[in-house]
Every structure is written in C-alpha cells, then in structure tokens.
Regions:
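Metal-dependent phosphohydrolase cores
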Residues: 1-192
Length: 192
C-alpha cells in the first residue's frame, strides 16, 4: 500500500508538472499552479491509491469495478476544467453547457498532460488525437461547441506535432470559430 501511495503521488505530481508547462504556454499561469489540487485530498487520494495500476486512471479502474467513483464525484465538482462540471438540468436528463474559454483550454492542457504522464516516451500528439477520436461525441455529455474546440486543438497539435496552438492568439481564435454562430442577415427587397 505504501509503495502504491508513492507511485500514485509521483504520477499525479508528474501530471501536474506537465499541466503547468502546457498552461504556461497558454498563459494560464494561476490555473497551472492550482490545477487538480483536490487529487491530494484524502477523498481522492486514498481511493486512487486503492485502484492504482500505473497504466490507467485509478478513477476509470474504480468505475469499472464499482460502476461509480467517490473520488470522481468529488473531483469533477471542484474542478471546472472538466466538461462534466458544466452539465445542468439533471432532472431532465442533463444539459451540457458551453465551457468558458479558460476552462476549455485548461481541459486541453489536462488531456495532453495525461498522455504525457501515462505514455511517457511513447507520447505523441497524434496518439493523443487518436485517443480523442476514440471517444464517441454522441455519448459524452459535452457541449457540441466545446467538443469542436477540443477537436480543433488536438487535431492541430497532431498535424503540427507540437503544442504551439496553446498560445493565446491561436487558442482564442480556435475557440471563437468553434463557438460563434453564423449570422444570417435577411435583406428585404425594395418595393418599386
């Protein structure tokens, strides 16, 4: 148990360093510092140690074993960079809400960092995009515009094989084109 505690602590701390580096490039300094601090809380830490494998998220392992995870319920309710945080109207099946720019961008930084932490030297931006494509967009409770933003960002990183699109000028542009609805202007003909 002590060995798994150390291994889990090392993995989440490594992940946190990668998130910080990605957030630094995205100019989300404070978010990089405070990212996922709840993972060190007893509620999240001890369950994650119990289900730690080193190759898969302990939360996913716990969900497979039990159908749910107390650590995940705790985590997603305290960290707005998770799309699950942005679901409301549960009495009617749940309505995914559009994630604000900074939360959506931190989520992208988080996804990349998870790949970097788990895949280590085998990590590529292409493998991360392949992971993203394996998610069925019709089955995840993510707002369609947030989904488009994440898809554009991860696809761009995959093509360019770097994370330069995290820089604010590009990331804000991709967010804008993902979330702005086209304006249809109706022009009335002049009566003669």
């Amino acid at each position: 148990m002590l060995k798994k505690s150390f291994q889990h602590f090392k993995l989440i701390s490594t992940h946190k360093v990668y998130v910080f580096k990605n957030c630094f490039k995205a100019r989300l300094f404070w978010r990089g510092i405070k990212h996922d601090l709840s993972k060190y809380s007893p509620t999240e830490f001890f369950e994650s140690v119990k289900y730690f494998t080193g190759t898969d998220s302990p939360i996913n392992v716990c969900k497979k074993a039990n159908g749910w995870s107390k650590a995940w319920m705790h985590h997603k309710g305290r960290n707005s960079h998770h799309y699950e945080y942005w679901v409301d109207n549960f009495d009617n099946g749940g309505t995914p809400l559009l994630m604000p720019y900074k939360d959506a961008l931190e989520m992208v930084c988080d996804y990349i960092a998870a790949g970097q932490a788990y895949q280590k030297k085998e990590f590529t931006y292409a493998s991360e995009y392949k992971w993203w494509q394996s998610k069925d967009k019709n089955k995840i409770a993510m707002h369609p515009d947030t989904y488009k933003f994440v898809d554009i960002m991860l696809k761009t990183m995959s093509v360019e094989e770097n994370n330069d699109c995290l820089r604010p000028i590009r990331a804000k542009h991709y967010y804008k084109i993902s979330t702005v609805k086209p304006v249809i202007k109706v022009v009335k003909k002049k009566e003669e």
